[in-house]
């Protein structure tokens, strides 16, 4: 309202307000945040300032002028004992984001803050402001209190320009009471009734807070094994997966969506064939992705069509043999028919395990891209490659300078998220703060290729994929190293 052609002058520089707007609720919230001001009065003051700024004849606006108007209004309301209210360009927010109707509907349904009656009380811009403010506060922990506002602005611009987006729990929960910001967790499943249902309970808590869970059921004794304590017969891993699936059905993630799980079973578990076909009926285990944990020795046996041993995890004894080639073909056939199971290369994962002294990696997050130790969690985020095309030259090209900057800021954002997140279990908090893993990925690759006029199914596309991901990996490692120099190495480094 009335900001077109106006310029805000601050110590940081001159800012054209044409692309910005005054948001009544945002400034009202700023007023009420550190002062005992009734919400109705705070809103009246905010609307007063909006009108005064819009009606100004001068095209230049300074913060002292706004402050003078604010102080006069506070005196009028008898609010002379208020805390100092810092004014800067963040009191204006960017005009509406260019979001599709579908995107807006998803935001309204799952992400935007609602009041006790279910009424939406924030815009997409305010959601991003809430997230940016919360994540930037982590700078204080490292003695960078003066950088909080700077980082808030950088993070806000990243988000509103849709160049980077964090995982859903960060958008949902940052700056709110729940405060659980991580998307993916891995929980151990021990071979006892207590261990199994402890894991189920923990999974329910995580799902309620907005996270997804990965499990390895490989420690569970196979079906029809003797249970020493009762003299009964074990029902096997797949039966307990069904219990986990049913529980997941009943718990919405963060009160907004159903939970998600990953189940992994080692290829040498005696129940591996039952596991491979556990999702043959498409109405079962709908809250699980499943993957077979294969080993190097199994893959070698596949090449030679050799038999391999099945091992009972309860006692480590051989319980039978199967032909590796036949098992592999059964796996591929079932994956072709309905998409599950996938394959996880366990030995390959553990060769890259950065903290082998803490244990073996035996599972991943629900989508499979993030291997984690038992009782470990991770924050994820994605860079939107479609936003990094340079049109200044005759032929569109990738803007690697801008991409480098975004990688570095994204790494910092995700590292800050570790400190700002609340964790559903103390064991997870300890592991996360000890290892400080983050997951930085990409989206918009097809859109990038379209802008570069490169066919998706071409050798050139593969070449671009390798170049871009190699660049992102190299720069993210460099950014991580700088954070290590600045903040210290992660506690479990030694």
Language model feature labels by segment:
Residues 1-494:
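Extended catalytic cores of very large enzyme megasubunits
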């Amino acid at each position: 309202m009335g900001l077109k052609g106006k310029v805000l002058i601050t110590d940081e520089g001159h800012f054209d307000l044409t692309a910005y707007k005054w948001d009544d609720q945002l400034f009202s919230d700023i007023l009420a945040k550190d002062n005992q001001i009734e919400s109705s009065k705070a809103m009246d003051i905010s609307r007063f300032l909006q009108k005064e700024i819009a009606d100004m004849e001068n095209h230049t606006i300074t913060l002292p002028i706004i402050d003078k108007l604010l102080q006069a209004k506070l005196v009028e309301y008898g609010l002379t004992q208020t805390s100092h209210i810092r004014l800067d360009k963040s009191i204006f927010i960017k005009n509406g984001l260019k979001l599709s109707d579908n995107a807006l509907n998803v935001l309204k349904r799952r992400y935007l803050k609602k009041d006790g009656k279910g009424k939406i009380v924030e815009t997409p811009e305010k959601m991003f402001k809430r997230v940016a403010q919360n994540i930037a506060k982590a700078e204080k922990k490292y003695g960078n209190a003066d950088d909080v506002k700077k980082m808030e602005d950088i993070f806000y611009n990243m988000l509103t320009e849709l160049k980077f987006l964090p995982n859903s729990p960060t958008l949902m929960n940052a700056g709110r009471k729940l405060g659980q910001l991580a998307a993916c967790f891995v929980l151990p499943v021990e071979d006892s009734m207590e261990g199994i249902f402890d894991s189920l309970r923990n999974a329910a808590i995580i799902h309620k807070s907005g996270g997804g869970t990965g499990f390895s059921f490989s420690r569970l004794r196979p079906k029809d094994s003797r249970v020493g304590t009762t003299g009964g017969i074990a029902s096997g891993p797949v039966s307990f997966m069904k219990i986990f699936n049913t529980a997941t059905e009943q718990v919405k993630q963060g009160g907004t969506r159903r939970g998600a799980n990953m189940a992994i079973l080692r290829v040498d578990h005696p129940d591996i064939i039952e596991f491979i076909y556990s999702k043959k009926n498409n109405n079962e285990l709908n809250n699980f992705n499943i993957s077979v944990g294969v080993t190097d020795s199994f893959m070698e046996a596949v090449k030679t069509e050799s038999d391999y041993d099945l091992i009972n995890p309860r006692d480590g004894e051989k319980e039978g043999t199967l032909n590796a080639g036949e098992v592999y073909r059964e796996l591929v056939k079932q994956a072709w028919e309905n998409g599950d199971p996938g394959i996880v290369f366990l030995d390959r994962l553990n060769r890259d395990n950065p903290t082998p002294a803490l244990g073996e990696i035996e599972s991943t997050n629900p989508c499979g891209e993030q291997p984690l130790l038992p009782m470990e969690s991770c924050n994820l985020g994605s860079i939107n490659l479609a936003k990094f095309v340079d049109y200044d030259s005759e032929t569109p090209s990738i803007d690697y300078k801008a991409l480098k900057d975004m990688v570095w800021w994204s790494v910092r954002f995700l590292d800050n998220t570790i400190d700002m997140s609340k964790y559903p279990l103390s064991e997870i908090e300890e592991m996360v703060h000890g290892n400080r893993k983050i997951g930085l990925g990409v989206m918009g690759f097809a859109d990038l290729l379209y802008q570069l006029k490169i066919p998706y199914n071409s050798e050139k596309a593969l070449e671009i994929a390798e170049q871009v991901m190699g660049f992102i990996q190299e720069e993210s490692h460099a950014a991580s190293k700088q954070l290590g120099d600045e903040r210290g190495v992660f506690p479990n480094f030694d």
